[in-house]
């Protein structure tokens, strides 16, 4: 979801946020990601992130599953954010690997395993190799053997890479709008896309048609 701000730029516009949630649900979307990259996650304060998750989950009120992004530079900070999202009622969390100075594969696995032990809700791993430690097919196989780790959002922009993730048997979301029809026909569980914010009916219709194999 995108994040609506007040006209003066000082704070989130909660009424518009709630209205946008209602519009998306009215269009038939199957779930919402709160504090997404599209929602300017990297530029939000911790208080704004907490508000988006808390107010979002409260307003959605069980009408659809909610995924809350809790990415952070350090594992301990990420665990704190993950627990807060779980306490707020999020259905799942979405977490990028450590970024800025990416660790080795061993460090990436440690990061996700520590978070998985700290919460009970599912974790969506977030592959953005342009911005963080890349998640490879082999690393993903190791990660999905850990309880709570199954889903991955692939925003690599490489359809062949997405297909490799699918072949592991894990559940894969594609995060690149332009690949939507091809990713869904290849077997992706779903899309986490920005376009749904301004054309939700078309996005839902595309997903449903492909799900029904009406290519």
For the regions a language model picked out, list residue spans one by one.
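Active-site beta->alpha loop and helix N-cap motifs at the rims of alpha/beta catalytic domains
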Residues: 3-132, 142
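Catalytic alpha/beta core domains of metabolic enzymes, predominantly
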Residues: 114-117, 129-215
